[in-house]
Amino acid sequence: MCDIMEIKKFIETIKGTKLFTAYNTNVDAIKYLKDEDVQKLVDEFNHKDIIERMEEYPRIIEEPLDFVARLVHSIKTGKPAEVPIKDDKKLHEWFDRIKYDEERMGGQAGIVSNLMATLQIDKIIVYTPFLSKKQAEMFVDYDNLLYPLVENGNLVLKKVREAYRDDPIKINRIFEFKKGLKFKLNGEEITAKQSTRFIVASRPEALRIEIKDDVRKFLPKIGEAVDCAFLSGYQAIKEEYRDGKTAKYYFERAEEDIKLLKKNKNIKTHLEFASISNIEIRKMVVDYILSNVESVGMDETEIANVLHILGYDELSNNILKDSFIEDVIEGAKILLDKFKNLEVVQVHTIYYILFVCRADNPLSKEELEECLEFSTILASTKAKLGNIRAIDDLHEGLKIPHNKYGDLLKEIAEKFNDNNYKIALSPSRYVEKPKSTVGLGDTISSGAFVYYVSLLNKKRMS
């Protein structure tokens, strides 16, 4: 199939789909790190203090040393990470003195909404609790991208850019680095194993991951208006707030949100997992959200973290240590066995994207692979160009070949297909030095999920 026809087929498949996304959008301030940037950062501190703090592995950034220690750890291991920052004026001022290279849309709901609007699916309804003018302007200017408001007691869908309020702005600082970046720490030369990113995530006290009551009562109506929902941002929930509300309160509301969305129409829902440093919050995402959705997307570290919560410590540690595909597939099967609500577990890594389903899934293995192939093209396009601004950009992603391990990975995955499970794998189209890695996982997951729902709908209608 020629490139133009292949892209046309993919876009034609998804064009009738309607999507709801929530909850997290923010402004990403991005710094593309060079060798000298990191060297300058580590030289601000005693190198032995950095090493000691790395061993302590801080789960919240309370001072600049915590940040430098976790950044170095991320570079050294080649693993992406997201760590919340304490809401402290002096600490924010320290980060503000860094010269960032650009600002762009951040947050899974924001990134996915912009992508799907650009790909011209039929309708996207996005909800985020904060929508300042600056945030609203970071959404792409398309008529298919809408925000739910209540006016005179009625649900109204407005273009996102016209729906802004006088809300605070949530800013995440993103530190991107490329494979091969080098610096010295205490006499040791450290080299970045992979191109990835480290996120310093702000958690403003005023930000609550919830749908406000006025819109919330219309969730059954919103659910009726869409085919599927892509849900994310739960990592921003705090254990406790100054007004006495707790994580349990917000997770109970979030669980109810899913039920309300499905009240009038049995839509497909997807949880996009994330790097969650707080183990209690991670457990609540599993207990309240994972147990209520049909689809979940995660990377290998995230599936390992979920398996740890479920008590599979040895398998979890093996995945964290070696990332063998056999262990990842075994972990995905465990999730399907534990959570009967799940139809599909999707795992994305640098080298592949994987679907693990039960054998009775209505889509064939070839159709599942088609979903994954579409998502790899989206990912390679975004990695190469930094962003997807038009459908024609996908031709750039399609030019990038699958990585050299593709045949071996497909061969291994094929061995796990049996009477109980259906497994599909697509090797990634590997961009050696990506322009940007932020949002790659969200791009992969949303592409695969929306395509999956589109094929299910077509199958049902035929």
UniProtKB/Swiss-Prot annotation:
Protein's UniProt keywords contain Ubl conjugation: no
Cell compartments where the protein resides: Cytoplasm
Domain ADPK: 1-458
Enzyme Commission designation: 2.7.1.146, 2.7.1.147
Superkingdom, taxonomy of origin: Archaea
Keyword Cytoplasm tagged: yes
A GO BP annotation: fructose metabolic process
Catalytic residues as annotated in Swiss-Prot or TrEMBL: D442
Broad EC category: transferase
Summary of pH dependence: Optimum pH is 6.5.
PANTHER family: ADP-DEPENDENT GLUCOKINASE (PTHR21208:SF1)
HAMAP family on file: ADP_PFKinase
Name of this chain's protein: Bifunctional ADP-specific glucokinase/phosphofructokinase
UniProt gene name: pfkC
